[in-house]
Amino acid sequence: MLRIPVRKALVVLSKSPKGCVRTTATAASNLIEVFVDGQSVMVEPGTTVLQACEKVGMQIPRFCYHERLSVAGNCRMCLVEIEKAPKVVAACAMPVMKGWNILTNSKKSKKAREGVMEFLLANHPLDCPICDQGGECDLQDQSMMFGNDRSRFLEGKRAVEDKNIGPLVKTIMTRCIQCTRCIRFASEIAGVDDLGTTGRGNDMQVGTYIEKMFMSELSGNIIDICPVGALTSKPYAFTARPWETRKTESIDVMDAVGSNIVVSTRTGEVMRILPRMHEDINEEWISDKTRFAYDGLKRQRLTEPMVRNEKGLLTYTSWEDALSRVAGMLQTFQGKDVAAIAGGLVDAEALVALKDLLNRVDSDTLCTEEVFPTAGAGTDLRSNYLLNTTIAGVEEADVVLLVGTNPRFEAPLFNARLRKSWLHNDLKVALIGSPVDLTYTYDHLGDSPKILQDIASGSHPFSQVLKEAKKPMVVLGSSALQRNDGAAILAAVSSIAQKIRMTSGVTGDWKVMNILHRIASQVAALDLGYKPGVEAIRKNPPKVLFLLGADGGCITRQDLPKDCFIIYQGHHGDVGAPIADVILPGAAYTEKSATYVNTEGRAQQTKVAVTPPGLAREDWKIIRALSEIAGMTLPYDTLDQVRNRLEEVSPNLVRYDDIEGANYFQQANELSKLVNQQLLADPLVPPQLTIKDFYMTDSISRASQTMAKCVKAVTEGAQAVEEPSIC
């Protein structure tokens, strides 16, 4: 087992009655008193010197130490003096003892740090003017603050050959100071043992031993944790300096997790995307698709309205002409002749505006691309389609049953939580579905959905495991609900969850049943009353079809009458735009203030980082203008007014960064028994089986050259996308 952080390693362990190892919190009366530069502070036993110093606001320099990684203690930059101790100690690895007086700025501490810094700089190249880490480099900052003012090293510096670890991370290994943060991240957080050290002493190198790609959906995070410029972003190389960019706090919409991000822009262009701390969602990590797919925001964009001419070709036109044509069709056709499909990247403001517009023409055929069973309780109960336990709540669970999902590629940050709990809390995981690499061990129960019946009836051995669990979770992937027996699968999972609550020691507040969504718009659409799936449109093909960012290919021209008038509103010329008669260019998530609801039901906002390209406009504004031209004006003119309308329809949509607990009623399970559908024998196979299936899943990532390089590198090897080095 990996070495866990010192603080956790020293927590008292106790055996539960059932033999499980549990951690016990330290009582307040057991706190010990230590002194930091003469200032008293009370800390728990096992607290390190560095943590005690931080508690009183004293920052200790460090390179190898990271709060979310195990303690390595190999950079020695955090050396401090302990009063009456013979030698300085490494603050990150030394637990405090009662009565210690820690001297952080004594002559001995300063001299020790100067010596360590001198050794670190002895072989470090003077690359600062051409290094992408310049301006946000820990080595720059700490050498300025804690280092000497001159160098005594006159010999030649060592040089290390760079490693090719894929199309995302650029390596300049001569700059590496062997802090091993990247190695520990790879093995502990990402769960991929691709990185390690070879050699010793002055010959030590960090790399992959044999040349291979760093195969992880979280690989870009090693760029952030690298304290020097040894690991930088290949797509961002030599494009901008940190002080030249404007930072905008926003959220990611590439999956349904809703990771918090910072969008860095310059001169109206997105230069890079970085993670933003949110302990309850993504902590401080983001997936590679979130980080690197931003170049897709400037490719294949729809920048002007377009209409199909008499020759069947799409030609540019004015907003007035395009909206007038659409308005004419809405005035001609009413009721069931008008329908709409919402795509995976659509915000809540656009969803409610489109809903209001179609209601004005007496139509309620508003559908989502993703299917969700409506039989039984269906979408009437919010708890039926949410990750009720929450993402952070995974760390409290003791047993997790995954059904028909591959969270590693469907929701990488949710999977990282599962791994974290498995690593530190002895979480037991089981999977029903295709055997996949989840980066942690699990019990594979099989791939047949009929196993759910056995678990529900109590005849399966895993039923006993769930029964004995204190806080079990059943996580059903939304991809499993796209099947013809989706309603039966949902009913079976609901039955399992209800029986666990009745027979085990689950408390009233703990939610057992969870749905893991894959797309960012699904929860908000269901909250607003959209019908999941396009079956209603296939059964009753409309005369006018409005595709709002619908690029999933769930419906084609062949599914519709030849005279069906199709409007596509979105930001990329992907799957939906080519079949449209009118194209209305919309804004992407970095170009608008918009509301999205993640898989746990948490509403969050994107913020405007750049302006939309060309004549593109925000989606709700386009729909509002269309309603006015069609003579059915919607009653809102500003973003605040649209959000007031959102609050009228579903109040939780404007309670930002708050989760409204969804009650799971027993009636939901009773209604699920009315589902008249049988489980199929077909195996549960998630659509994103391997990392190759992870990179290009929506209109933005499909337009990204960086994501295309990743797919090529995975299938053909990292050498297939290797570019000549400039530096």
Swiss-Prot record:
Binding, [4Fe-4S] cluster 1: 124, 128, 131, 137
EC number of this enzyme: 7.1.1.2
Domain 2Fe-2S ferredoxin-type: 30-108
InterPro entries linked: 2Fe-2S_ferredoxin-like_sf, 2Fe-2S_ferredoxin-type, Mopterin_OxRdtase, Mopterin_OxRdtase_4Fe-4S_dom, NADH_UbQ_OxRdtase_75kDa_su_CS, NADH_UbQ_OxRdtase_ferredoxin, NADH_UbQ_OxRdtase_Gsu, NADH_UbQ_OxRdtase_Gsu_4Fe4S-bd
Subunit and interaction comment: Core subunit of respiratory chain NADH dehydrogenase (Complex I) which is composed of 45 different subunits. This is the largest subunit of complex I and it is a component of the iron-sulfur (IP) fragment of the enzyme. Complex I associates with ubiquinol-cytochrome reductase complex (Complex III) to form supercomplexes. Interacts with MDM2 and AKAP1.
PANTHER family associated with the record: NADH-UBIQUINONE OXIDOREDUCTASE 75 KDA SUBUNIT, MITOCHONDRIAL, RESPIRATORY NITRATE REDUCTASE
Protein name: NADH-ubiquinone oxidoreductase 75 kDa subunit, mitochondrial
Annotated organism of origin: Pan troglodytes
